Design a protein with these regions (language model features):
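Acidic, metal-coordinating helix/loop segments flanking the phosphotransfer/catalytic sites
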Residues: 47-68
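Receiver (REC) domain active-site loop signature in two-component systems and cognate sites
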Residues: 75
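C-terminal output helix
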Residues: 106, 124-134
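Acidic catalytic/metal-coordinating carboxylates
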Residues: 49-50, 79-82
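Short amphipathic alpha-helix used as the core "switch/output" element in two-component signaling
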Residues: 56, 81-92
Length: 143
């Protein structure tokens, strides 16, 4: 286990024995709910309220390599599609699951075309999200 202090709300604790799920959503209550859900599955979760905060940590802390990213589409500043585009251009590779309250025409298609594993509408069914996260982890482990 590795514990590092970053600009995030608290220290980031990395446990290489558990899958790490990164959650990016500007709604703190969604972040808390998703973190509880992920941790109930014996996985680690780190939450971020902006895409820039998440990307900055990826760049600043090479050991921070999430196994999956749950990413809100509509956020102030950098939206989820922009985060995904930056990931695709950079050296970081991870399955991306989009969540959104606004299923605008074309957004789902853009996300999937850019490589998103799934696109779930809020409020999402916990079981569907769990199944989708497990599928993402399975795909990542199979290369």
């Amino acid at each position: 286990m590795l514990m590092l202090s970053t600009g995030a709300p608290g220290p980031i604790v990395l446990n290489k024995n558990k899958p790490l799920i990164a959650i990016v959503d500007d709604d703190a209550s969604v972040c808390r709910a998703l973190r509880r859900l992920v941790r109930s599955l014996a996985m680690d979760a780190e939450t971020f309220t902006t895409g820039q905060q998440f990307l900055d940590l990826l760049d600043a802390m090479p050991s921070f390599q999430p196994d999956c990213l749950v990413l809100d589409v509509q956020m102030p500043g950098m939206n989820g599609l922009e985060v995904q585009e930056r990931l695709a251009r950079g050296k970081h590779s991870m399955p991306v699951i989009f969540i959104t309250a606004h299923d605008e025409i074309g957004t789902r298609e853009k996300a999937v075309a850019a490589g998103a594993l799934a696109f779930l509408r809020k409020p999402f069914n916990d079981e569907l999200l769990i199944k989708t996260v497990r599928e993402a982890l399975k795909r990542k482990s199979n290369g």
